[in-house]
Amino acid sequence: MKTDIRNLDLNLLKALDALLDERSVTRAAERLALTQPAVSGMLTRLRECFDDPLFTRAQRGVVPTLRALELAQPVKAILAEVSELLQPKAFDAATAEMTIKIAATDYALRAVIVPFMAALRAQAPGIRVAVLPVNNEQLSAQFERGDIDIALITPDSAPPDLHARSLYDEEYVCLMREDHPLSAQTGLTLDSFCAQDHALVSYVGGNFKGVTDEALAAVGRSRRVTLSVCSFLVLPEILRVSDLISVVPRRLTHDLPGLKVLPPPLAIQGFNKIVVWHERTHRDAGHRWLRELLFSTAI
C-alpha cells in the first residue's frame, strides 16, 4: 500500500525517532513529554501510514522491524533539516548558551582541549563543554543518539558515516627528568636508548609494547619496558622521580617543568589526529563556529 504523505505529520516522525532510539514506549513517552497511551496511539497511526508493524513487543520494550530500521536514518535527517529551518542562522558566540559534548582521550585533553578551552572562555563564556571518554566501538551510535557532538580520534578509528577533517600530524619525542644521566647528551644513541628502563602508555591497559617497539624490531633491536600505565597524565610525575624514560607525543611535552625532551635515536612513526562529527550538527552555525575554533587553537 502506498503511503499518503498527508497522513504524516512532524509529531509522528518525532515519535518514530524516539521509539527507534529508546526501544520502549514508556521511555519514548518520557522523552517526548507525552503520556504512554498517546505514544501508543501515534504508533498505531504510524503502522497505518507505513503499512508495517514497525515494532514488536519484547520482554523488555519493543523491537523494530526491518522496515523501521530502514526508516531510522531518513527520519533523523528530516528532523534535523526541519530543526535547522526553525533555528536562526545568525550565531553570536559572545552571547550563545549551549553545551557541546566532545569525546577525547587524556592525550587529546591536554594537547587539544586545554588550548581550546582557553580561547572558548574568552570568546564564548556561555558555552559549556562536556568531555567524555572515547569509545571507538560505539562512536556511530553515540553520534546518532546525540550523546556526543565531536570526537578527537585517529583516522583508523573513524566510522565511514561521519564527517572528518585532519587536525594535525603528531610526532614522538623522548622524555626524561632534567637531571637524568642521559639528559646531558645532545642526542641519544640507539645503544643508550635501549639500555634504559622505559615507561609507556597503554590505553587498553597492561600492554608492554607499542609503536616504539615496532620501530626497534625493524632494526633488530629491543628495549626493556618496566612500567605500563593507562594514562598520559600521570607519566610526567613518574618520570620526575625515577630514571625511567618514555617516548611520548610531542604535544604532551609543553610546559612540563623538571623534564627534558630529546629526539629519539630512530624513526618512530607518528600519527594523525582528526576531528569527526555527525551530519546532525554539520550545518549548525554554532557547531560550525566551535569546530573552527577547535582547529584554530590546535597547537
Where do the protein language model's features map onto the residues?
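Short helix-boundary/capping micro-motifs
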Residues: 17-34
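A short LG(V/I)-centered, amphipathic sequence patch enriched
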Residues: 47-66
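Alpha-helical linker/hinge and terminal dimerization helices associated
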Residues: 49-50, 71-93
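Flexible hinge/capping segments at coil-to-helix
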Residues: 94, 162-198, 287-288
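Central regulatory/effector-binding core of bacterial HTH transcription factors
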Residues: 95-160, 229
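Hydrophobic hinge/microswitch elements
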Residues: 135-140, 144-148, 153-154, 204-262
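Beta-alpha-beta core module
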Residues: 160-166, 170, 233-282
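Secondary-structure junction motif
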Residues: 182-184, 190, 196-219, 283-287, ...
